[in-house]
Amino acid sequence: MAEKRNIFLVGPMGAGKSTIGRHLAQMLHLEFHDSDQEIESRTGADIAWVFDVEGEEGFRIRETQVVADLTEKQGIVLATGGGSIQSKEIRNNLSARGIVVYLETTIDKQVARTQRDKRRPLLQVDDPREVLESLAEVRNPLYEEIADVIVKTDEQSAKVVANQIIEQLGF
């Protein structure tokens, strides 16, 4: 691969963006970045704390800056936060600076993959399924709008999905 390309993974919570992203980066010899981990690194606090102290709006401001910074790099795989897609600025940066891969999954899989994860502030409610359905209604059309490639992640291992992405991108 003479030209260093960026691959940006978008999709809902529990789609496997971070896990698949790590495999993809390793297989393609690219740097891996996770926007949520970068926010935690810069703030010295976990995402739940940022949400508690700054609210979702404060978190989204940080997320927009982190994604802007990371998408300036070359030769990376970036796992974005599930809600980052709602920012027009982030959508524009992702579309302009790399290949956008939408990791699609079902609500059932999201529930199964996230039910014990206390680090997801939006799901710390009585009915996380209802929240996930509501988020999907708003976000799924945005994922589809900017995706160069759509890959289903439901019944496959992260490594298999990473291989499918490589195949679809012709790398």
UniProtKB/Swiss-Prot annotation:
<feature type="binding site">
    <location>
        <position position="156"/>
    </location>
    <ligand>
        <name>ATP</name>
    </ligand>
</feature>
<dbReference type="InterPro" id="IPR023000">
    <property type="entry name" value="Shikimate_kinase_CS"/>
</dbReference>
<keyword id="KW-0808">Transferase</keyword>
<keyword id="KW-0028">Amino-acid biosynthesis</keyword>
<keyword id="KW-0418">Kinase</keyword>
<keyword id="KW-0057">Aromatic amino acid biosynthesis</keyword>
<dbReference type="InterPro" id="IPR000623">
    <property type="entry name" value="Shikimate_kinase/TSH1"/>
</dbReference>
<dbReference type="GO" id="GO:0009073">
    <property type="term" value="P:aromatic amino acid family biosynthetic process"/>
</dbReference>
<feature type="binding site">
    <location>
        <position position="60"/>
    </location>
    <ligand>
        <name>substrate</name>
    </ligand>
</feature>
<feature type="binding site">
    <location>
        <position position="18"/>
    </location>
    <ligand>
        <name>Mg(2+)</name>
    </ligand>
</feature>
<comment type="function">
    <text>Catalyzes the specific phosphorylation of the 3-hydroxyl group of shikimic acid using ATP as a cosubstrate.</text>
</comment>
<dbReference type="Pfam" id="PF01202">
    <property type="entry name" value="SKI"/>
</dbReference>
<feature type="binding site">
    <location>
        <begin position="14"/>
        <end position="19"/>
    </location>
    <ligand>
        <name>ATP</name>
    </ligand>
</feature>
<dbReference type="InterPro" id="IPR031322">
    <property type="entry name" value="Shikimate/glucono_kinase"/>
</dbReference>
<protein>
    <recommendedName>
        <fullName>Shikimate kinase</fullName>
        <ecNumber>2.7.1.71</ecNumber>
    </recommendedName>
</protein>
<feature type="binding site">
    <location>
        <position position="120"/>
    </location>
    <ligand>
        <name>ATP</name>
    </ligand>
</feature>
<dbReference type="InterPro" id="IPR027417">
    <property type="entry name" value="P-loop_NTPase"/>
</dbReference>
<keyword id="KW-0067">ATP-binding</keyword>
<keyword id="KW-0963">Cytoplasm</keyword>
<comment type="pathway">
    <text>Metabolic intermediate biosynthesis; chorismate biosynthesis; chorismate from D-erythrose 4-phosphate and phosphoenolpyruvate: step 5/7.</text>
</comment>
<comment type="similarity">
    <text>Belongs to the shikimate kinase family.</text>
</comment>
<keyword id="KW-0460">Magnesium</keyword>
<dbReference type="GO" id="GO:0004765">
    <property type="term" value="F:shikimate kinase activity"/>
</dbReference>
<feature type="binding site">
    <location>
        <position position="139"/>
    </location>
    <ligand>
        <name>substrate</name>
    </ligand>
</feature>
<dbReference type="GO" id="GO:0009423">
    <property type="term" value="P:chorismate biosynthetic process"/>
</dbReference>
<dbReference type="GO" id="GO:0000287">
    <property type="term" value="F:magnesium ion binding"/>
</dbReference>
<feature type="binding site">
    <location>
        <position position="36"/>
    </location>
    <ligand>
        <name>substrate</name>
    </ligand>
</feature>
<feature type="binding site">
    <location>
        <position position="82"/>
    </location>
    <ligand>
        <name>substrate</name>
    </ligand>
</feature>
<keyword id="KW-0479">Metal-binding</keyword>
<dbReference type="GO" id="GO:0008652">
    <property type="term" value="P:amino acid biosynthetic process"/>
</dbReference>
<comment type="subunit">
    <text>Monomer.</text>
</comment>
<keyword id="KW-0547">Nucleotide-binding</keyword>
<dbReference type="GO" id="GO:0005829">
    <property type="term" value="C:cytosol"/>
</dbReference>
<dbReference type="GO" id="GO:0005524">
    <property type="term" value="F:ATP binding"/>
</dbReference>
